[in-house]
Amino acid sequence: MAFKKKFAPRRKFCRFCADKDLPLNYKRPDILRDFITERGKIIARRITGTCAHHQRLLTREIKRARQMALLIYTATHDSGVQKKSSI
């Protein structure tokens, strides 16, 4: 027997289509950080809700910001090896 969902998920919308004043620019890493994971991966548009046009622009601007060292490529990697203390 299949269970029915109690509520429908909220409709996702493109933040950039809704707010025309929101700049999509590599110079604004504070906005671009909302669209990458903590590991540095670009979040898919089916999750963020951006339209196809703005997702392409968003991807291009994130890559530009990475080249300009405004955003990280990947998360910092801990090797798991502990450093010896100098006591």
From Swiss-Prot:
It comes from the Bacteria. The keyword Zinc does not apply. One of its GO terms (cellular component) is cytosolic small ribosomal subunit. GO terms for molecular function: small ribosomal subunit rRNA binding; structural constituent of ribosome. The keyword Ribonucleoprotein applies. PROSITE patterns: RIBOSOMAL_S18. Keywords: Ribonucleoprotein, Ribosomal protein, RNA-binding, rRNA-binding. Pfam families: Ribosomal_S18. GO terms for biological process: translation. Belongs to the bacterial ribosomal protein bS18 family. PANTHER family: 30S RIBOSOMAL PROTEIN S18, SMALL RIBOSOMAL SUBUNIT PROTEIN BS18M. Binds as a heterodimer with protein bS6 to the central domain of the 16S rRNA, where it helps stabilize the platform of the 30S subunit. HAMAP family: Ribosomal_bS18. Part of the 30S ribosomal subunit. Forms a tight heterodimer with protein bS6. This is Small ribosomal subunit protein bS18.
